[in-house]
């Protein structure tokens, strides 16, 4: 007898095929259909991805592809120890881009041009030339004010603001690039 092949295709779209007789119960529980697409008869228009949407693979529940990664733990802060590198950032695994380095160096040069001094220079301390304290909070002699460029602290004249350092830093960066 004629019968529709059992699959996930709705019966109105299934093509009628002859079922061979004498199939075992196992073979009957896993029917096959050589052409699971809709019949070519009629004026039925289906989307091109119809077979993909109605395939057995689309019925399988899948796990979410979103995975949440936590950031690696930061090393513990040891009191009394400072990293003397001005390029040290909390995430050392992520390298700085050339633009970030140029921006940092431009702002360092801008602080020098605006008469800012590191804490060791402002307090006339005998520290190595390239030693940059991480902070200048409550260390700048009056009337100078504390300004930070990255992690480097500077004692600047009162008229110098962070925005002024940034703008002069842009000009310094263009000088470095030859612009």
Curated annotation (Swiss-Prot):
Keyword tRNA-binding tagged: no
GO cellular component: extracellular region
Stretches for region Disordered: 1-41, 60-82
Listed transmembrane segments: none
Cellular compartment(s): Secreted
Chief location: secreted
Keywords, ordered alphabetically: Secreted
Tissue-wise expression: Component of the acid-soluble and acid-insoluble organic matrix of calcified shell layers (at protein level).
Record field: compositional bias (Polar residues): 1-37, 60-70
Position of the signal peptide: none
Record's protein name: Uncharacterized protein 2
Species name: Haliotis asinina (Donkey's ear abalone)
Upper lineage: Eukaryota, Metazoa, Spiralia, Lophotrochozoa, Mollusca
């Amino acid at each position: 007898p004629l019968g529709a092949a059992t699959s996930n295709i709705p019966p109105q779209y299934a093509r009628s095929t002859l079922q061979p007789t004498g199939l075992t119960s196992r073979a009957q529980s896993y029917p096959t259909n050589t052409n699971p697409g809709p019949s070519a008869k009629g004026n039925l228009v289906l989307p091109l991805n119809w077979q993909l949407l109605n395939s057995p693979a689309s019925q399988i529940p899948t796990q979410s592809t979103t995975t949440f990664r936590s950031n690696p733990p930061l090393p513990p802060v040891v009191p009394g120890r400072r990293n003397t590198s001005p390029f040290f950032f909390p995430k050392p695994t992520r390298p700085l881009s050339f633009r970030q380095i140029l921006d940092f160096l431009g702002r360092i040069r801008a602080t020098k041009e605006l008469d800012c001094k590191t804490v060791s220079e402002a307090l006339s301390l005998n520290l190595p030339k390239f030693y940059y304290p991480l902070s200048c909070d409550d260390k700048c002699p009056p009337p100078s004010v504390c300004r930070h460029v990255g992690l480097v602290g500077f004692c600047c004249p009162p008229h110098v603001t962070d925005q002024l350092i940034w703008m002069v830093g842009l000009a310094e960066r263009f000088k470095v690039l030859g612009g």
